Amino acid sequence: MIFFSLRRVFRPLARLLRRLAPVDRGARLWARAPWWEKGLAMGALLAFAIVVPLTLPTYWQSVLFFPVGIYIILALGLNIVVGMAGLLDLGYVAFYAVGAYTTAKLTTTFGWGAWQSLPMAVFIAMVAGVLLGAPTLRLRGDYLAIVTLGFGEIVRIVAQNTDSLGASRGITGIRHPQAIFGTEFKFAPLPYYYLALAAIVVGLFLLLRLTRSRVGRSWAAIREDEDAAEAMGVPTFNMKLWAFAMGAATGGMGGWLYASKVGFINPDNFPFFFSVIILAAVVLGGMGSVPGVIAGAFAIGFIPEYLRDAAAGKTIRDVLNFVTGGDVHDITEYRVLLFGFALVVMMIFRPQGLIPSRQRAAELAEAGEDRGLAATPTTTHEAAEDAPAPGQPAPTSAALAAEADGASVTELPVEVEAAETVLELEKVTMEFGGVVALNDVSITVARGQIFGIIGPNGAGKTTLFNCVTGVFRPTSGDVLVNGSSVLGRRPHRITEAGVARTFQNIRLFPNMTALENVVVGTDARHGTSVPGALLGLPRHRREEREGKVEAQRLLDYVGIGARAGDLARNLPYGDQRRLEIARAIATGPSVLLLDEPAAGMNPSEKQALIGLIRQIRDSGLTIVLIEHDMGLVMGVCDRLAVLDFGGKIAEGPPQDIQNNPRVIEAYLGAPEDTGAA
């Protein structure tokens, strides 16, 4: 009986969660709204947040500070790590604890005022994030999650067993902030609520600056495909470390607020379950979505407290008794269970969250899991609000050219060097556990050439590219770019040295637009720092404008300028290949490595690709090409090298290679012996 009664409740609830179309349409309209409309809406929302608490009783004012306000601050910080950079952190409560304990020690032991301890609490938490991230961020997925979980428990256990930190007794007598503008900070919740609100507003301002900059694009690229991001010049380790540091600093801010308000902390305030709650807020709201995370944190903090309220509990009790025919007397003791059950239902029927980011919605749609969204992506990623919305026409080439002072669309960002030899491999050998993938390979590529590398599958062609780009470090030998050795450099450093590549299997950032993909490439040539992005320095704003203009030019150059606002995953296969080439060119290379660019193309697409490759070469860019299509190779290459079983068996002009008996036997195929019996 109870089972069938619950079905009566949850069937309509499931339909509601699947069809949150007004929320999704509103998110799309918000993404396309002009700046002044967004400003008015945010101003009205801020006024609402300021005025409404004045009408509430003290209990609900206290709830708005903790848990709601603290949860929102912490969820915004964790969203940087989990939602934007794609790093799973299960020990986030540690940074909250570090901020709280720093405040407690400075105000009780060293006599600091609460305001004076604020920057130190944030800084120490940030340092803790760096100390955790530096040795662990080369781990990925579950391994990183396990390490962060352990860190969270270590911080709590250290606090519990350290006498100077109060051990299990905790620390009492933490100072409240001194009065400002006549406002006293004692135990009354309202001043602390407004303090938390101010922290949220300032944090949102800084966060939006980051997400609309190179930093935000780098985080999005890392989440989409970390290896491809590194190949496009993104310093992935540094950017992940910045994400950890920013998230930790936000957690430290939350710890300062909490300790300053309650005046007493102990290790029991920072259990592992608290990290789970904040992570649940991020997932519930929509990973990567700032408004979604705020909504999720509000729900996580407010609803259990609402269920605790006697009047609300009586209402829900009456509803449950009516539906199930049971006799529930005290609903408050089941509030966590009911809320947990509601979260499970939410995650089943709307896994993208309340207000999902565009990336999250697209990922779930691609996996066939997204039952709650229309085909059109819901919201534009905050990192590129200025980019065309998906499916919308891009800015015209003429308008962009005018913005860039009339620079020519055909100009490529080619790195100009005096050296005649662009790329040189000197006796490169690559072994994997005794298996020789490359054996003493030497190749010299002259400036302005289209140099082809051919050979049967397994000959070592892609391994050679991986050695050049820093994915693998050769067992022996050397790799020189423009006369300088790049051996041992990380892939993004080799990109900076002038090497760009495409991949055998297309590796775009599928849930970013075509324009955003190429802008990630242009970022490799810009030097804007994270502090510069936070402060919105003139250089940063100029580079942002120039990067978008140049990205649109390159899309026009490869023939897909009209698709700039489309998600990369929605482009036809041939256009995806062109986009990958445009993104690689955007890094400003002196040599472009193309790994089987014609694979999967039809004859007309291949013919267009031949024209594009020649056009790129004529613009001054050297090309090294791996390809199995002999018609394409013989038609565009100036010189060829042939690999077989990891060794170079021939090198020379295409005609000589075509007639080389050893190449014919190993790869091209010998003519059939008609005289055989």
Where do the protein language model's features map onto the residues?
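Transmembrane alpha-helices and adjacent helix-loop boundaries
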Residues: 1-394
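Generic N-terminal initiation segments characterized by hydrophobic and/or small/turn-forming residues
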Residues: 1-3, 61, 162, 168, ...
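Short linear motifs at secondary-structure transitions and domain/linker junctions
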Residues: 17, 21, 28-30, 38-40, ...
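Residue-level detector of alpha-helix boundaries and kinks
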Residues: 32, 50, 139, 268, ...
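Compositionally biased, intrinsically disordered low-complexity regions
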Residues: 172-175, 184, 342, 355, ...
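ABC-family P-loop ATPase nucleotide-binding domain
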Residues: 359-429, 672-677
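Glycine-rich phosphate-binding loops of nucleotide-dependent enzymes
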Residues: 414-677
